[in-house]
């Protein structure tokens, strides 16, 4: 099993290219099933979850063409949904990826039936699919859950437009319902919708392909269904979580970084906390520069919340920052339970963290010490790498397969910035 070895103590300097967003590309790939002709998606990141989704689309019968080589900069993928014949998404392919449930809406809406195995993914608490099921039922779907599968069908041809109010904000639930409504008959209204940039990106992709969507990025989305979407091209937005991770890494190490072709407006909460920590930040229309040379960060308090609040996917990285910051920082996790599993590993490096329910109280220390640690989920993996960048000696991070689900060539990118980091098999 692969491991990553990090030798700490080197500030990060330079420019880094941010990949396409993992949490945007997965629903967008699913949305190509709604078209009646090939769709080209560009700025596709090379990630384990992306490859899994591609394999799922192939399993369903879709034609998939990798353009310019999957590992080339600016890569794109063309999906031809006209060959789809299969309606069952098997467990052996979905067991490692929760986003597989996003195939439910498009398959049901276009083909009248779908069976999707209950998904797997990061072990960071309960993320039930009941909101997906109830949302699709509001459009006329008949759904049962049995033998580990969500089985859905439409008894009267097409789904029918309807109104649905989410009990709790659900990003993937909003995306599933949005895709299904795009080709349902009539008008659908989605209330208490997720407002994340990735939801907006999906909506913009659907609109590019001929969907009629208004209100994406607000709590109320209105969709006027069309019979089928068209061929088209769409570029995935840059990954705001990868952007934030590199910014935090640079702030922790006392370095300087520049990023081009990013979306600063999607990172207001993160940039605000980095400024609070003492970083000097310059923001352009599509660029971010951060300078933390010669300074130790100050501890920050934060509470995770749905967008536009502080993203839960950046919580672990800021906990790593607080571990070496000056002062005491309080972190409250309100989105997922069990999302403090990285704490025990940070403690092995010498961090001082006290857990009280869903709150972590972090007393900053001057330095951490390298040690063997184990990744427990995707963002925890990133936090351990960040901690390793500032620890004395070597930090060896095991179970990094989590990392490859959401970060494209992170060790290569950090190496270009000056980090001493390598992958070991």
Swiss-Prot record:
This is UDP-N-acetylglucosamine 1-carboxyvinyltransferase. It comes from the Bacteria. GO terms for biological process: cell division; cell wall organization; peptidoglycan biosynthetic process; regulation of cell shape; UDP-N-acetylgalactosamine biosynthetic process. InterPro entries: Enolpyruvate_Tfrase_dom, Enolpyruvate_Tfrase_sf, MurA_subfamily, RNA3'P_cycl/enolpyr_Trfase_a/b, UDP_GlcNAc_COvinyl_MurA. Pfam families: EPSP_synthase. It is found in: Cytoplasm. Its EC number is 2.5.1.7. Keywords: Cell cycle, Cell division, Cell shape, Cell wall biogenesis/degradation, Cytoplasm, Peptidoglycan synthesis, Pyruvate, Transferase. The gene is murA.
């Amino acid at each position: 099993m692969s491991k990553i070895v990090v030798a700490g103590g080197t500030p990060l300097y330079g420019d880094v290219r941010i990949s396409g967003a993992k949490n945007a590309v997965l629903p967008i790939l699913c949305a190509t099933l709604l078209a009646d002709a090939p769709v080209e998606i560009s700025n596709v990141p090379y990630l384990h979850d992306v490859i899994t989704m591609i394999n799922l689309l192939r399993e369903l019968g879709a034609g998939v063409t990798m353009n310019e080589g999957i590992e080339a900069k600016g890569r794109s993928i063309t999906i031809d949904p006209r060959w789809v014949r299969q309606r069952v998404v098997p467990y052996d392919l979905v067991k490692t990826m929760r986003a597989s449930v996003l195939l439910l809406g498009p398959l049901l809406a276009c083909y009248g039936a779908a069976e999707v195995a209950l998904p797997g993914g990061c072990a960071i608490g309960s993320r039930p699919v009941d909101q997906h099921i109830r949302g699709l039922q509001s459009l006329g779907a008949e759904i049962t859950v049995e033998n580990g599968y969500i089985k859905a069908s439409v008894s009267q041809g097409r789904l029918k437009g309807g109104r649905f109010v989410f009990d709790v904000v659900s990003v993937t639930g909003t995306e599933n319902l949005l895709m299904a409504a795009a080709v349902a008959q009539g008008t659908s209204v989605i209330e208490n919708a997720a407002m994340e940039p990735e939801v907006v990106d999906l909506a913009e992709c659907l609109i590019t392909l001929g969907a009629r969507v208004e209100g994406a990025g607000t709590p109320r989305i209105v969709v006027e269904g069309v019979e089928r979407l068209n061929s088209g091209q769409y570029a995935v937005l840059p990954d705001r979580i990868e952007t934030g991770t590199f910014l935090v890494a640079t702030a922790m190490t006392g370095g300087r970084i520049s990023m081009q072709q990013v979306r600063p407006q999607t990172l207001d909460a993160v940039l605000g906390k980095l400024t609070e920590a003492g970083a000097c930040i310059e923001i352009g229309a599509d660029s971010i520069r951060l300078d933390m040379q010669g300074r130790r960060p100050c501890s920050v308090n934060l509470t995770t919340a749905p967008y536009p609040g502080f993203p839960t996917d950046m919580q672990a990285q800021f906990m790593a920052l607080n571990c070496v910051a000056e002062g005491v920082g309080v972190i409250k996790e309100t989105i997922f339970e069990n999302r403090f599993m990285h704490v025990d590993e940070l403690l092995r490096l010498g961090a001082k963290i006290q857990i009280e329910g869903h709150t972590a109280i972090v007393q900053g220390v001057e330095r951490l010490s390298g040690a063997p640690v184990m990744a427990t989920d995707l963002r925890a993996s990133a936090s351990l790498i960040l901690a390793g960048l500032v620890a004395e000696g070597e930090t060896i991070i095991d179970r990094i397969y989590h990392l490859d689900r959401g970060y494209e060539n992170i060790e290569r990118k950090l190496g270009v910035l000056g980090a001493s980091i390598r992958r070991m098999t």
